[in-house]
C-alpha cells in the first residue's frame, strides 16, 4: 500500500498534487465514457426493462457493472490495498430523508429526461442535442440545490431523518457481513450476470464494456485513496464516480474567472465526454440529433 502511494510521488512532484488528481479523474473518466458508450450502460433502460418484465439484456448489462464494482472494491479492501473508511459517504452524518426524496426525484427525472446524468453526458458526446440541453438543465439545477436558490429546501429535507456517520452508515457492519460478505455478494451477482448474459446472448461489447465501467468505479476509489496518501499540501478526498456534484462543479468552472482550483471531479466530466466521443468516432456513430425523434 505504501509502495503504491510512493510510486505516485514522481508524478506529483512533476505536475503537482492538484493536476495529478485532475488528470486521474480525466483518465478514469475517459475509460468510463468509452466503456459506457460501447456497452450502452444505462440505469434508465435497466429499470424500464425490469418494470416491463422484458429480457433484452439491458438489466444484465447494468448487473455486470454493479457486481464488478462491488466485487473489485471489496477485493481491494480485503487485500489491504486501500481503506475507504475515511470516505465522505461513510464518515459524514447521513440523511435518509434526503436519500429517499432525492432518489425518488432523480429516478423520476431520469425516466422523463430519457437518461441519468452519466447517460446524458455520453449521448451528448455523440451528438445528441436533446441530451446536451437536458444535461445543462441538470447541471444548473444541481448547482442551485448545492449552493443556490434551492439549497435551503435541500437542507430542510435532508434534516428530516439523519443517521450518524461511521458504522451507522456501513451496511456491511450493520448486517455483520464484513468485507468478505461484500465480496461474496458481488461474486454471486456477477455469476448471475454471466448466466443471464449467456442466455440472453448479450453481445461482446455489452458485457465487456459493462465490466469495464465497473472496473472504473473501483479504480476511482483506489486512485483517489493512493493520491490522498501521497499528497502533502492538499486534502484529497477519497471518492468514486458520481455526476451530480461534478456536473455542477464543471459548469461553475466554465462560468467562473480563470484560476479556479482543480480536482478529480473537474477531470472526470470532460474525460467521460471525450471517451464517449472517441468511441462514437471509432465506430462511426457520431450523429447530430435533435428533439424530434432524438
Residues of each region from the PLM?
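Membrane-interfacial helix-loop segments of redox and metal-homeostasis proteins
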Residues: 1-294
Amino acid at each position: 500500500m505504501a509502495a503504491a502511494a510512493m510510486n505516485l510521488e514522481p508524478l506529483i512532484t512533476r505536475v503537482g498534487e492538484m493536476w495529478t488528481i485532475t488528470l486521474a479523474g480525466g483518465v478514469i473518466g475517459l475509460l468510463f465514457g468509452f466503456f459506457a458508450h460501447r456497452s450502452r450502460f444505462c440505469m434508465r433502460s435497466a429499470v424500464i426493462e425490469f418494470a416491463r418484465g422484458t429480457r433484452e439484456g439491458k438489466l444484465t448489462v447494468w448487473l455486470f457493472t454493479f457486481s464488478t464494482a462491488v466485487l473489485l472494491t471489496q477485493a481491494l479492501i480485503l487485500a489491504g490495498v486501500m481503506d475507504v473508511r475515511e470516505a465522505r459517504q461513510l464518515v459524514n452524518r447521513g440523511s435518509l430523508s434526503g436519500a429517499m426524496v432525492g432518489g425518488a426525484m432523480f429516478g423520476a427525472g431520469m425516466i422523463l429526461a430519457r437518461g441519468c446524468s452519466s447517460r446524458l453526458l455520453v449521448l451528448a458526446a455523440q451528438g445528441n442535442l436533446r441530451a446536451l440541453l437536458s444535461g445543462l438543465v441538470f447541471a444548473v439545477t444541481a448547482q442551485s440545490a448545492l449552493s443556490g436558490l434551492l439549497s435551503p429546501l435541500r437542507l430542510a429535507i435532508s434534516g428530516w431523518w439523519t443517521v450518524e456517520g461511521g458504522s451507522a452508515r456501513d451496511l456491511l457492519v450493520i448486517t455483520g457481513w464484513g468485507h468478505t460478505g461484500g465480496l461474496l455478494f458481488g461474486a454471486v451477482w456477477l455469476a448471475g450476470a454471466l448466466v443471464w448474459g449467456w442466455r440472453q446472448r448479450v453481445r461482446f461489447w455489452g458485457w465487456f464494456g459493462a465490466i469495464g465501467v465497473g472496473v472504473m468505479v473501483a479504480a476511482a476509489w483506489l486512485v483517489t485513496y493512493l493520491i490522498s496518501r501521497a499528497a502533502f499540501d492538499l486534502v484529497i478526498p477519497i471518492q468514486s464516480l458520481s455526476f451530480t456534484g461534478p456536473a455542477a462543479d464543471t459548469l461553475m468552472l466554465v462560468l467562473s474567472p480563470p484560476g479556479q482550483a482543480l480536482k478529480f471531479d473537474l477531470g472526470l466530466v470532460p474525460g467521460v465526454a471525450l471517451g464517449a466521443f472517441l468511441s462514437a468516432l471509432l465506430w462511426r456513430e457520431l450523429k447530430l440529433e435533435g428533439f424530434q425523434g432524438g
